[in-house]
Curated annotation (Swiss-Prot):
A motif (Effector region) lies at residues 35-43. Signal peptide: none annotated. This is NF-kappa-B inhibitor-interacting Ras-like protein. The lineage of its organism: Eukaryota, Metazoa, Ecdysozoa, Nematoda, Chromadorea. Atypical Ras-like protein that may act as a regulator of NF-kappa-B activity. GO terms for molecular function: GTP binding; GTPase activating protein binding; GTPase activity. In contrast to other members of the Ras family, the members of the KappaB-Ras subfamily do not contain the conserved Gly and Gln residues in positions 13 and 65, which are replaced by Lys and Val residues, respectively, and are therefore similar to the constitutively active forms of oncogenic forms of Ras. This suggests that members of this family are clearly different from other small GTPases proteins. Residues 1-199 are annotated as: Small GTPase-like.
Length: 199
């Protein structure tokens, strides 16, 4: 038996959410097939490492959010999510604006409960001429404290890093130290420095 996490994948219409998930979970390139709007779907990805329990990512594919009007996700997605993956097309600036609004909406929902939910952003269609500048997007991601990956649904290898990042962040979180050595604690005369440990 393995451990599972639920990842909700959201973004505007026609940004390639389903194409990304089909490539990751089914090893199928659907980028050349006619566009079919997604209502919702679920995919599973198994992460396996020797001598470790199986880890399963349950990826929830959602209908594309409208390019106009207020942002809102189904309550069931918000309640179930262990992480969010926000997708925009680097060839469509409006889809980037919607991701910015989605990020702020998610922050407001989880800010009420003081709960931190990881958010990863995918800049899809990196193989097309970009209208969203890469440096601008990375600057935005740093300011919003999210991890940004530039990917293309045509290339499965470009998608591997974000899957491993999401899984590792959930199943193997690193403990951030709450203490730091200040200058007052460091003795210049002592040849045997003390070590502070975070428990």
């Amino acid at each position: 038996m393995g451990r599972a996490m639920r990842v909700v994948v959201v973004g505007g219409k026609k940004v390639g959410k389903t194409a990304i998930l089909r490539q990751v979970a089914c090893v199928e390139d659907v980028t050349n097939k006619p566009y079919e709007p997604t209502i919702e779907d679920t995919y599973q990805v198994l992460l396996e490492e020797p001598d470790k329990a199986r880890e399963i990512l349950i990826l929830h594919d959602t209908a594309g959010v409208s390019n106009y009007g207020p942002i809102e996700l189904k309550k069931a997605y918000v309640q179930a999510a262990d992480a969010f993956v926000l997708v925009y097309s680097s060839a469509d600036y409006e889809s980037f604006n919607r991701v910015d609004l989605l990020k702020k909406w998610i922050d407001r929902q989880f800010g009420k409960d003081k709960k931190e939910v990881p958010i990863v952003v995918l800049a899809n269609m990196r193989d097309r001429p970009a209208t969203v500048d890469s440096a601008f997007a990375h600057s935005w991601a740093a300011r919003e404290k999210v991890k940004l990956f530039e990917v293309t649904a045509k290339d499965r290898q470009s998608l591997v890093d974000f899957i491993h990042y999401v899984g590792h962040r959930h199943f193997h979180p690193t403990k951030e130290s709450k203490f730091s050595l200040s200058k007052k604690l460091k003795s210049e005369k002592s040849s045997n420095p003390a070590i502070l440990m975070d428990f």
